[in-house]
Amino acid sequence: MSKVKKNDETLSEVLVDVNRVTKVVKGGRSFAFSAYVVVGDKAGRVGAGHGKAKEVNEARGKAKQAAKKRMMKVPLYQNRTIHHDVVGKSGAAKVILRRAKAGTGIIAGGSMRAIFDSLGVHDIVAKSIGSTNVYAMISATFDALNKLASPKSIAMRRDKKVNEISVKSADIQVNE
């Protein structure tokens, strides 16, 4: 995960979740708002953040700042999908991300769709298993995105050329 600084003008912001939270004190109840925001540049960079304040707009602003601090770069295949299938986990939430053919679209639920829109992915199939909690699903999705690697980065890590590690299905021979 590499930290990235971008201008506010180029970032898209999606408010994923807003909750009213309560703190019980001696004099009664104290209300505040909790917000979860996803930001991205639609070109391979995305981040998510959480903010809490007395007003919704303040909570949203804090969440946006936290999301910008946590922005990460994700390698994309042809700037439309991911390079390989991957699984991410966070607590009881588990997400499976699968690459898709051109024209498939984003097949994903709620908060995952917001992440992929902000990331700039156009074709992906995502399945969530277990917990449907927004925070857990976003965390699991980011865990999966952190596991993604491009063939170029894998080749560099192994001190090989890209064509040595990329195996096409036609090149695999089956012994019958």
UniProtKB/Swiss-Prot annotation:
One of its GO terms (molecular function) is structural constituent of ribosome. GO terms for cellular component: small ribosomal subunit. The keyword Ribosomal protein applies. Pfam families: Ribosomal_S5, Ribosomal_S5_C. Disulfide bonds: none annotated. Residues 11-74 form the S5 DRBM domain. Keywords: Ribonucleoprotein, Ribosomal protein, RNA-binding, rRNA-binding. PROSITE patterns: RIBOSOMAL_S5 (PS00585), S5_DSRBD (PS50881). NCBIfam families: rpsE_bact. Part of the 30S ribosomal subunit. Contacts proteins S4 and S8. With S4 and S12 plays an important role in translational accuracy. The N-terminal domain interacts with the head of the 30S subunit; the C-terminal domain interacts with the body and contacts protein S4. The interaction surface between S4 and S5 is involved in control of translational fidelity. Belongs to the universal ribosomal protein uS5 family. This is Small ribosomal subunit protein uS5.
